[in-house]
Curated annotation (Swiss-Prot):
Bilayer-crossing regions: none
GO cellular component: extracellular region; fungal-type cell wall
Gene responsible for this protein: SC16
Summary of subunit composition and partner proteins: Self-assembles to form functional amyloid fibrils called rodlets. Self-assembly into fibrillar rodlets occurs spontaneously at hydrophobic:hydrophilic interfaces and the rodlets further associate laterally to form amphipathic monolayers.
Protein name per the record: Class I hydrophobin SC16
Length: 114
């Protein structure tokens, strides 16, 4: 029974372990984009996705003519992880941030090999 309890408590910690992203040439990822910092978003969605447009409407966020992705639950890459940059989700550059990173619009994925 103790083994099972220990396993149940250890699994979330193992799931949170992330790899350090590297660019395609083996270096570390960029710390900023031309529009600001590199973000790590838990999820990216098409700006035309019905659920995404509903969320944007609820938060009164108008994206205008943007045709890029919408990043959800994003954090600047420089504050993620302990002892260095890491991201286990999608790294992106975004033009606008709302709700302290809850929603980022105008996002473009960054090609970083993990």
């Amino acid at each position: 029974m103790r083994f099972f309890a220990t396993l149940v408590l250890a699994l979330p910690a193992l799931a949170m372990a992330t790899a350090v992203p590297r660019d395609v040439n083996g270096g570390t990822p960029p710390k900023s984009c031309s529009s600001g910092p590199v973000y790590c978003c838990n999820k990216t969605e098409d700006h035309l996705d019905k659920g995404t447009t509903a969320l944007l409407g609820l938060l009164n966020i108008k994206i205008g003519d943007l045709k890029d992705l919408v990043g959800l639950n994003c954090s600047p890459l420089s504050v993620i992880g302990v002892g260095g940059n890491s991201c286990s989700a999608q790294t992106v550059c975004c033009t606008n941030t709302y709700q302290h990173g809850l929603v980022n619009v105008g996002c473009t994925p960054i090609n970083i090999g993990l």
